[in-house]
Protein backbone atom coordinates (compact mmCIF):
# COMPACT_ATOMS: atom_id res chain seq x y z
CA UNK A 1 0.00 0.00 0.00
CA UNK A 2 1.50 3.34 -0.99
CA UNK A 3 1.83 6.11 1.50
CA UNK A 4 -0.66 8.94 1.20
CA UNK A 5 0.84 12.37 0.71
CA UNK A 6 0.77 14.61 3.77
CA UNK A 7 -1.57 17.57 3.74
CA UNK A 8 -0.19 20.71 2.20
CA UNK A 9 1.73 23.23 4.20
CA UNK A 10 -1.14 25.69 3.93
CA UNK A 11 -3.75 23.25 5.22
CA UNK A 12 -4.39 22.95 8.93
CA UNK A 13 -6.98 20.18 8.70
CA UNK A 14 -8.69 17.70 6.40
CA UNK A 15 -11.66 15.33 6.37
CA UNK A 16 -11.24 12.15 4.31
CA UNK A 17 -8.33 13.81 2.52
CA UNK A 18 -10.21 16.97 1.55
CA UNK A 19 -9.10 20.30 3.06
CA UNK A 20 -11.38 21.50 5.84
CA UNK A 21 -11.52 24.27 8.41
CA UNK A 22 -10.40 23.54 11.93
CA UNK A 23 -13.96 23.86 13.21
CA UNK A 24 -15.22 21.40 10.60
CA UNK A 25 -12.48 18.92 11.43
CA UNK A 26 -13.11 19.25 15.17
CA UNK A 27 -16.83 18.68 14.64
CA UNK A 28 -16.19 15.62 12.46
CA UNK A 29 -13.79 14.21 15.06
CA UNK A 30 -16.35 14.79 17.81
CA UNK A 31 -18.99 12.91 15.80
CA UNK A 32 -16.68 9.91 15.37
CA UNK A 33 -15.81 9.87 19.06
CA UNK A 34 -19.41 10.20 20.21
CA UNK A 35 -20.42 7.17 18.11
CA UNK A 36 -17.45 5.02 19.14
CA UNK A 37 -17.86 1.92 21.31
CA UNK A 38 -14.52 2.55 23.01
CA UNK A 39 -12.33 5.41 21.80
CA UNK A 40 -8.59 4.90 21.95
CA UNK A 41 -6.37 7.92 22.59
CA UNK A 42 -3.03 6.57 21.40
CA UNK A 43 0.45 7.65 20.39
CA UNK A 44 0.56 10.42 22.98
CA UNK A 45 3.69 11.94 21.49
CA UNK A 46 2.97 15.30 23.08
CA UNK A 47 4.14 17.75 25.71
CA UNK A 48 2.59 17.92 29.18
CA UNK A 49 -0.22 20.26 28.14
CA UNK A 50 -1.10 17.96 25.25
CA UNK A 51 -1.01 14.92 27.53
CA UNK A 52 -3.34 16.56 30.03
CA UNK A 53 -5.75 17.44 27.23
CA UNK A 54 -5.61 13.85 25.94
CA UNK A 55 -6.41 12.43 29.38
CA UNK A 56 -9.28 14.89 29.73
CA UNK A 57 -10.62 13.81 26.33
CA UNK A 58 -10.39 10.14 27.33
CA UNK A 59 -12.34 10.90 30.48
CA UNK A 60 -14.92 12.83 28.49
CA UNK A 61 -15.46 10.00 26.00
CA UNK A 62 -14.95 6.97 28.26
CA UNK A 63 -11.87 6.13 26.22
CA UNK A 64 -8.44 4.58 26.79
CA UNK A 65 -5.09 6.37 27.04
CA UNK A 66 -2.04 4.59 25.64
CA UNK A 67 1.48 5.79 24.80
CA UNK A 68 3.29 4.39 21.77
CA UNK A 69 6.15 3.22 24.05
CA UNK A 70 3.99 1.92 26.89
CA UNK A 71 5.49 -1.57 26.79
CA UNK A 72 9.00 -0.29 27.55
CA UNK A 73 7.76 2.27 30.06
CA UNK A 74 5.85 -0.36 32.00
CA UNK A 75 8.80 -2.75 31.98
CA UNK A 76 10.77 -0.10 33.87
CA UNK A 77 7.85 0.83 36.10
CA UNK A 78 6.86 -2.67 37.24
CA UNK A 79 9.89 -3.35 39.49
CA UNK A 80 9.39 0.05 41.11
CA UNK A 81 5.83 -0.66 42.14
CA UNK A 82 6.43 -4.31 43.02
CA UNK A 83 9.70 -4.32 44.99
CA UNK A 84 11.10 -0.78 44.99
CA UNK A 85 14.23 0.38 43.18
CA UNK A 86 17.33 2.53 43.61
CA UNK A 87 17.31 5.48 41.19
CA UNK A 88 19.63 8.38 40.53
CA UNK A 89 19.65 11.38 38.19
CA UNK A 90 21.86 11.98 35.15
CA UNK A 91 23.54 14.90 36.91
CA UNK A 92 24.40 12.96 40.05
CA UNK A 93 25.58 10.00 38.00
CA UNK A 94 27.90 12.18 35.94
CA UNK A 95 29.39 13.97 38.94
CA UNK A 96 29.67 11.09 41.42
CA UNK A 97 29.90 7.78 39.58
CA UNK A 98 33.32 6.13 39.58
CA UNK A 99 31.91 3.00 37.91
CA UNK A 100 29.32 3.09 35.14
CA UNK A 101 27.80 -0.24 34.10
CA UNK A 102 26.23 -0.08 30.65
CA UNK A 103 23.86 -2.95 29.94
CA UNK A 104 22.65 -4.13 26.53
CA UNK A 105 22.54 -2.16 23.31
CA UNK A 106 20.57 0.79 21.93
CA UNK A 107 21.94 3.16 24.58
CA UNK A 108 23.15 5.98 22.35
CA UNK A 109 20.01 5.65 20.25
CA UNK A 110 17.89 6.09 23.38
CA UNK A 111 19.99 9.04 24.54
CA UNK A 112 22.11 10.58 21.76
CA UNK A 113 23.90 12.80 24.31
CA UNK A 114 24.89 9.86 26.52
CA UNK A 115 28.59 10.40 25.90
CA UNK A 116 28.48 14.14 26.51
CA UNK A 117 26.04 14.20 29.44
CA UNK A 118 27.02 11.06 31.35
CA UNK A 119 30.10 9.17 30.23
CA UNK A 120 32.39 12.21 30.02
CA UNK A 121 33.22 13.43 33.55
CA UNK A 122 32.65 17.13 34.26
CA UNK A 123 35.56 19.54 34.55
CA UNK A 124 37.09 19.54 38.02
CA UNK A 125 39.41 21.93 39.88
CA UNK A 126 43.08 21.60 39.03
CA UNK A 127 44.67 18.75 40.92
CA UNK A 128 41.37 16.99 41.56
CA UNK A 129 41.03 13.79 39.58
CA UNK A 130 38.29 11.19 39.83
CA UNK A 131 39.01 7.96 38.03
CA UNK A 132 36.01 6.48 36.27
CA UNK A 133 35.65 2.99 34.86
CA UNK A 134 33.07 2.39 32.18
CA UNK A 135 32.17 -1.26 31.72
CA UNK A 136 29.72 -2.61 29.20
CA UNK A 137 27.85 -5.87 29.49
CA UNK A 138 27.40 -6.12 25.75
CA UNK A 139 24.95 -8.26 23.79
CA UNK A 140 27.73 -9.81 21.68
CA UNK A 141 31.51 -9.85 21.55
CA UNK A 142 31.84 -7.64 18.46
CA UNK A 143 29.42 -4.96 19.72
CA UNK A 144 30.37 -1.31 19.52
CA UNK A 145 28.94 1.73 21.24
CA UNK A 146 28.00 4.34 18.65
CA UNK A 147 29.40 7.86 19.05
CA UNK A 148 31.71 6.91 21.92
CA UNK A 149 35.47 6.84 21.53
CA UNK A 150 36.58 6.81 25.17
CA UNK A 151 37.99 3.95 27.21
CA UNK A 152 35.43 1.24 27.75
CA UNK A 153 35.82 -2.32 29.01
CA UNK A 154 33.56 -4.70 27.11
CA UNK A 155 32.31 -7.91 28.68
CA UNK A 156 30.34 -10.23 26.42
CA UNK A 157 29.36 -13.89 26.35
CA UNK A 158 29.24 -16.30 23.46
CA UNK A 159 26.56 -16.41 20.80
CA UNK A 160 23.17 -17.74 21.81
CA UNK A 161 23.50 -16.77 25.49
CA UNK A 162 20.82 -14.47 26.82
CA UNK A 163 21.58 -11.31 28.72
CA UNK A 164 19.35 -12.60 31.52
CA UNK A 165 21.63 -15.63 31.92
CA UNK A 166 24.69 -13.40 32.03
CA UNK A 167 23.10 -11.18 34.66
CA UNK A 168 22.11 -14.20 36.74
CA UNK A 169 25.68 -15.52 36.65
CA UNK A 170 27.08 -12.08 37.47
CA UNK A 171 24.70 -11.64 40.39
CA UNK A 172 25.70 -15.04 41.78
CA UNK A 173 29.41 -14.20 41.61
CA UNK A 174 28.84 -10.82 43.29
CA UNK A 175 27.29 -12.71 46.21
CA UNK A 176 30.14 -15.23 46.17
CA UNK A 177 27.95 -18.10 45.05
CA UNK A 178 29.03 -20.91 42.78
CA UNK A 179 27.65 -21.11 39.28
CA UNK A 180 27.32 -23.95 36.84
CA UNK A 181 28.59 -24.11 33.30
CA UNK A 182 28.33 -20.82 31.44
CA UNK A 183 29.45 -19.40 28.10
CA UNK A 184 30.62 -16.30 29.97
CA UNK A 185 34.36 -16.82 30.69
CA UNK A 186 34.78 -17.31 34.44
CA UNK A 187 37.77 -14.98 34.64
CA UNK A 188 35.89 -12.18 32.88
CA UNK A 189 32.82 -12.76 35.02
CA UNK A 190 34.77 -12.53 38.27
CA UNK A 191 36.68 -9.51 37.00
CA UNK A 192 33.44 -7.67 36.29
CA UNK A 193 32.01 -8.66 39.66
CA UNK A 194 35.08 -7.25 41.44
CA UNK A 195 34.87 -3.99 39.49
CA UNK A 196 31.24 -3.52 40.53
CA UNK A 197 31.87 -4.47 44.16
CA UNK A 198 34.80 -2.06 44.30
CA UNK A 199 32.74 0.94 43.21
CA UNK A 200 32.39 3.84 45.64
CA UNK A 201 29.34 5.04 43.72
CA UNK A 202 28.23 2.91 40.80
CA UNK A 203 25.44 3.41 38.30
CA UNK A 204 23.80 0.84 36.01
CA UNK A 205 22.44 2.26 32.74
CA UNK A 206 20.09 0.62 30.24
CA UNK A 207 17.13 1.21 27.96
CA UNK A 208 13.98 -0.84 28.47
CA UNK A 209 13.37 -0.66 24.71
CA UNK A 210 16.06 -3.36 24.33
CA UNK A 211 15.67 -5.35 27.57
CA UNK A 212 13.00 -7.79 28.68
CA UNK A 213 11.12 -7.68 31.97
CA UNK A 214 13.24 -10.49 33.47
CA UNK A 215 16.49 -8.73 32.59
CA UNK A 216 15.34 -5.48 34.17
CA UNK A 217 14.17 -7.30 37.29
CA UNK A 218 17.54 -9.07 37.47
CA UNK A 219 19.38 -5.74 37.19
CA UNK A 220 17.49 -4.24 40.10
CA UNK A 221 18.23 -7.34 42.16
CA UNK A 222 21.91 -7.07 41.29
CA UNK A 223 21.94 -3.43 42.42
CA UNK A 224 20.22 -4.34 45.70
CA UNK A 225 22.91 -6.95 46.32
CA UNK A 226 25.69 -4.43 45.63
CA UNK A 227 24.17 -1.97 48.10
CA UNK A 228 24.87 -4.40 50.92
CA UNK A 229 28.54 -3.40 50.77
CA UNK A 230 28.76 -0.24 48.63
CA UNK A 231 26.66 2.44 46.93
CA UNK A 232 25.12 1.55 43.60
CA UNK A 233 22.11 2.96 41.78
CA UNK A 234 20.31 2.76 38.44
CA UNK A 235 19.62 5.15 35.59
CA UNK A 236 17.07 3.67 33.16
CA UNK A 237 17.09 5.80 30.01
CA UNK A 238 13.70 7.39 29.27
CA UNK A 239 11.53 6.32 26.36
CA UNK A 240 11.34 8.69 23.38
CA UNK A 241 8.37 10.89 22.49
CA UNK A 242 8.24 12.37 25.99
CA UNK A 243 7.40 8.94 27.39
CA UNK A 244 8.59 9.74 30.92
CA UNK A 245 6.70 13.05 30.88
CA UNK A 246 3.50 11.35 29.76
CA UNK A 247 3.96 8.71 32.47
CA UNK A 248 4.29 11.42 35.12
CA UNK A 249 1.22 13.31 33.89
CA UNK A 250 -0.84 10.12 33.82
CA UNK A 251 0.23 9.42 37.39
CA UNK A 252 -0.73 12.74 38.88
CA UNK A 253 -4.00 13.00 36.91
CA UNK A 254 -5.31 9.43 37.27
CA UNK A 255 -3.20 7.66 39.87
CA UNK A 256 -2.15 5.16 37.19
CA UNK A 257 0.27 4.97 34.26
CA UNK A 258 -0.84 4.75 30.63
CA UNK A 259 -2.99 1.82 29.45
CA UNK A 260 -5.80 3.17 31.58
CA UNK A 261 -9.46 3.25 30.56
CA UNK A 262 -12.31 5.52 31.63
CA UNK A 263 -15.27 3.47 30.42
CA UNK A 264 -16.32 2.55 33.97
CA UNK A 265 -16.67 6.19 34.97
CA UNK A 266 -13.35 6.18 36.87
CA UNK A 267 -9.79 5.34 35.80
CA UNK A 268 -9.06 1.60 35.52
CA UNK A 269 -5.52 0.42 34.75
CA UNK A 270 -4.97 -2.88 32.93
CA UNK A 271 -1.75 -3.32 30.89
CA UNK A 272 -3.17 -6.24 28.87
CA UNK A 273 -6.74 -5.11 28.38
CA UNK A 274 -5.81 -1.59 27.31
CA UNK A 275 -2.92 -2.45 24.98
CA UNK A 276 -3.55 -0.38 21.82
CA UNK A 277 -2.51 -3.09 19.37
CA UNK A 278 -4.79 -5.61 21.03
CA UNK A 279 -7.72 -3.19 21.19
CA UNK A 280 -7.46 -2.40 17.49
CA UNK A 281 -6.80 -5.99 16.37
CA UNK A 282 -9.77 -7.31 18.36
CA UNK A 283 -12.12 -4.58 17.18
CA UNK A 284 -12.85 -3.46 20.74
CA UNK A 285 -11.79 0.05 19.75
CA UNK A 286 -13.31 1.33 16.53
CA UNK A 287 -12.02 4.91 16.73
CA UNK A 288 -8.43 5.98 17.38
CA UNK A 289 -7.11 9.44 18.11
CA UNK A 290 -3.47 9.16 17.05
CA UNK A 291 -1.36 11.91 18.63
CA UNK A 292 2.20 12.46 17.46
CA UNK A 293 3.77 15.91 17.52
CA UNK A 294 7.36 14.72 17.98
CA UNK A 295 8.02 12.98 14.67
CA UNK A 296 7.10 9.35 15.35
CA UNK A 297 5.65 7.39 12.43
CA UNK A 298 2.05 6.18 12.82
CA UNK A 299 1.13 2.49 12.94
CA UNK A 300 -0.72 0.89 10.04
CA UNK A 301 -4.12 0.55 11.69
CA UNK A 302 -6.57 -1.62 9.79
CA UNK A 303 -9.06 0.25 7.60
CA UNK A 304 -12.05 -0.63 9.80
CA UNK A 305 -10.75 1.77 12.45
CA UNK A 306 -11.73 5.42 12.22
CA UNK A 307 -8.52 7.40 12.67
CA UNK A 308 -8.40 10.95 13.93
CA UNK A 309 -4.83 12.14 13.44
CA UNK A 310 -3.47 14.99 15.53
CA UNK A 311 0.06 15.21 14.18
CA UNK A 312 2.57 17.24 12.23
CA UNK A 313 1.55 18.22 8.71
CA UNK A 314 4.39 16.18 7.17
CA UNK A 315 3.31 12.89 8.78
CA UNK A 316 2.56 10.18 6.22
CA UNK A 317 -0.06 7.47 6.68
CA UNK A 318 -0.62 4.20 4.82
CA UNK A 319 -4.30 5.16 4.52
CA UNK A 320 -5.59 8.70 4.83
CA UNK A 321 -7.10 9.37 8.28
CA UNK A 322 -10.79 10.17 8.43
CA UNK A 323 -9.95 13.41 10.21
CA UNK A 324 -6.59 15.11 10.35
CA UNK A 325 -5.55 18.18 12.31
CA UNK A 326 -2.02 19.50 11.85
CA UNK A 327 -0.15 20.62 14.96
CA UNK A 328 3.24 22.12 15.66
CA UNK A 329 6.17 20.50 17.40
CA UNK A 330 6.55 21.21 21.14
CA UNK A 331 9.63 23.25 21.88
CA UNK A 332 9.91 24.32 18.25
CA UNK A 333 6.60 25.84 17.14
CA UNK A 334 5.40 26.66 20.65
CA UNK A 335 6.67 26.71 24.22
CA UNK A 336 6.35 23.40 26.03
CA UNK A 337 7.03 21.46 29.21
CA UNK A 338 8.62 18.06 28.57
CA UNK A 339 10.82 15.50 30.24
CA UNK A 340 14.51 16.10 29.62
CA UNK A 341 16.87 13.10 29.64
CA UNK A 342 19.73 15.51 30.37
CA UNK A 343 18.38 16.46 33.81
CA UNK A 344 15.96 13.60 34.46
CA UNK A 345 12.87 15.70 35.12
CA UNK A 346 10.34 18.03 33.49
CA UNK A 347 11.72 21.25 32.05
CA UNK A 348 10.26 24.28 30.31
CA UNK A 349 11.37 24.51 26.69
CA UNK A 350 11.05 27.79 24.83
CA UNK A 351 9.97 27.64 21.19
CA UNK A 352 13.02 27.70 18.93
CA UNK A 353 11.03 28.75 15.84
CA UNK A 354 7.62 30.06 17.01
CA UNK A 355 4.82 29.68 14.50
CA UNK A 356 1.06 29.92 14.36
CA UNK A 357 0.60 26.14 14.35
CA UNK A 358 -1.85 24.67 16.83
CA UNK A 359 -0.54 22.77 19.82
CA UNK A 360 -1.84 19.28 20.62
CA UNK A 361 -3.65 20.72 23.63
CA UNK A 362 -5.41 23.34 21.50
CA UNK A 363 -6.46 20.77 18.91
CA UNK A 364 -7.86 18.35 21.49
CA UNK A 365 -9.63 21.11 23.38
CA UNK A 366 -11.40 22.11 20.16
CA UNK A 367 -12.60 18.52 19.74
CA UNK A 368 -13.66 18.32 23.37
CA UNK A 369 -15.65 21.53 23.07
CA UNK A 370 -17.60 20.00 20.17
CA UNK A 371 -18.41 16.73 21.95
CA UNK A 372 -21.41 18.08 23.82
CA UNK A 373 -22.93 19.30 20.57
CA UNK A 374 -22.17 16.00 18.85
CA UNK A 375 -23.88 14.03 21.61
CA UNK A 376 -26.92 16.28 21.37
CA UNK A 377 -27.36 15.70 17.64
CA UNK A 378 -30.13 13.32 16.48
CA UNK A 379 -29.03 9.84 15.37
Regions found by a protein language model. Give the residues of each.
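An N-terminal, well-structured beta->alpha segment
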Residues: 1-30
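N-terminal start-of-chain detector that recognizes signal peptides
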Residues: 12-14, 71-75, 109
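Gly/Ser/Thr-rich loops at beta-strand to alpha-helix junctions
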Residues: 19-22, 28, 35-53, 105-109, ...
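A broad, structural surface signal
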Residues: 27, 31, 52-59, 220, ...
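Short secondary-structure boundary/capping segments within folded domains
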Residues: 30-33, 91
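Short glycine/proline-enriched coil/turn segments at helix->beta-strand junctions
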Residues: 34-38, 61, 303-304
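Anionic-ligand anchoring segments at beta-strand to alpha-helix junctions in alpha/beta enzyme folds, i.e.
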Residues: 40-95, 227-265
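Non-catalytic alpha/beta scaffold blocks inside enzyme catalytic domains
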Residues: 77-231, 257-379
Amino acid sequence: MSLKDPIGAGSAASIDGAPASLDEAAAAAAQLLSRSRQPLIAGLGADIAGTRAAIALAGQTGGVIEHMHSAALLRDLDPMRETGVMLTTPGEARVRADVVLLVGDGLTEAWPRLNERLLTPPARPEGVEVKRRIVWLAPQADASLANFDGDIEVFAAGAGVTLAANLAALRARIKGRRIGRTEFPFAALDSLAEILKGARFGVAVWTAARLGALEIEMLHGLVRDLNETTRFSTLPLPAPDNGAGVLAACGWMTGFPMRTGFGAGAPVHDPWRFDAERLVASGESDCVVWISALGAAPPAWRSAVNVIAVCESTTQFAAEPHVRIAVGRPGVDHDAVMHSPDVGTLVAVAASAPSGALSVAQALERIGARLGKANASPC
